[in-house]
Amino acid sequence: MGTLLDTTVFIDLERAVRRLAPASAMAEVSGRLEHQPGADEEVAIAAITASELLHGVHGATPEHRPRREALVEAVLAAFPPLPFGLLAARVHARIWAELAVAGQEVGAHDRLVAAAAIAAGWRVGTANIRNFDRIASLDTLTISFTS
């Protein structure tokens, strides 16, 4: 099993390591991930997570942009995006329909992350479990850098 990290993990990381250089921050990530998902486990991000992280770079103030961009580029180099293919699209459609029938809402990006993880037989690593707890077929793991 692998772990697909969602954007909240990296938001939490950025808050935890504001005073560290991006390389030091990535060393912190590696150390934490060895203890949380497991040292031998595959870890990646979803393509939508890459987009969300890059959106954060483009939306940052000129003062914060260089640091955020360095951190995001380090994340993208360390955790390649898991492709979103037809199987993930089928899983996404099922999740979306099940939630709609149940009258429950999960954000579009979180549904895409969940679908990619389920299609790969992986779980989602998140700093905010509430984003995913309504998706019955999804295995999750809380990953925090601030607690």
Name each model feature, range by range:
Residues 10, 50-53, 89, 132:
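A generic structural signal for short hydrophobic patches within well-formed alpha-helices
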Residues 45-48, 127:
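Substrate-recognition element of Asp-dependent hydrolases with the DxDx(T/V) motif
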Residues 55-58, 66, 78-125:
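Active-site neighborhoods of divalent-metal-dependent phosphate/nucleic-acid chemistry enzymes
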Residues 6, 12, 52, 110, ...:
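Acidic active-site catalytic centers that drive phospho-/nucleotidyl reactions
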Residues 1, 114-147:
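Acidic, PIN/NYN-like endoribonuclease modules and their adjacent C-terminal/linker elements
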Residues 8, 70, 90, 111-112, ...:
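Active-site phosphate/pyrophosphate-handling residues
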Residues 1-45, 57-74, 147:
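Short, well-structured N-terminal submotif of metal-dependent ribonuclease cores
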